[in-house]
Amino acid sequence: MRSSWMFVICFAMLILYTNGRILRPETSWEDELEDDLANNKRSLACSCEDGSGRTGTHWIFDCPKGWADCGGFRCCVETSK
């Protein structure tokens, strides 16, 4: 029985450390989720279908904050500041 608990603990530690990040207490789940979504940006260019002729970037999920959908399949452009 003791060896099975050690296996579970070692397996959990392996997952946490190979994942490359451990949640820090000072960060919230929303911040972590937002970072994860921002990291899911694809590096593929796309052409906006709104007639502007702009080139955007494909995103796996919806456009993040500071970006706008310009038509096409999840084609987003950075909004002007």
Swiss-Prot record:
* Top-level lineage group: Eukaryota
Any one GO MF annotation of this record: toxin activity
Organs and tissues of expression: Expressed in ectodermal gland cells. In adult female tissues, highly transcribed in mesenteries (gametes-producing tissue) and slightly transcribed in tentacles, pharynx and physa.
Identify the stretch annotated as signal peptide in this record. Answer: 1-20
Say yes or no: keyword Aminoacyl-tRNA synthetase present: no
Q: What does this protein do?
A: Has toxic effects on zebrafish larvae. It causes contractile paralysis and twitching of the tail within 30 minutes, followed by death within 40 minutes. Does not show any toxicity when injected into arthropods (cherry shrimps or grass shrimps).
The molecule here is called N.vectensis toxin 4
